């Protein structure tokens, strides 16, 4: 089984992925940012490095999806392959950070890849407001993220909402602005109760 956790930068995806993996005994698959050779340059000059960064991420996510499809374990994934395309690439293209030529080349690659993979058995979307995202980004203190603009985050949020509104697979939306699932066991239990109901038909 494949569980995907989706959400904007700073929404708590990695934290929730780790907690759910521990709770259910699932195997977590985290998106690696440590070894992306473009990430630091990207946040310094987004137009220059958008195509390089997004193509690198696409290759990594496709590799992850292929591994998940072959696994007999239940895997919970931090960020799905579709997010890279419908959120980050779409936002960069809209903002003029990707040329028409680069965008079309990227989409051709993505469409070829998607012909071989399927949607997660459940997608958990962490819906977060800008203030919540900014607070989390500042709190975790990653240097390369401190230059992210409000405009950029807002564009990502808008594309997330558009994508989720058209999503056709099994979906669970968690609004994160007024909960603290990391530190409040009741908030985390409320999420797992909803997952139990969706996956296992438990009340």
Whereabouts are the PLM-identified features?
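Post-Walker A alpha-helix
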Residues: 16-17
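A glycine- and Lys/Arg-enriched "phosphate-lid" helix/loop adjacent to the NTP-binding pocket
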Residues: 87-159
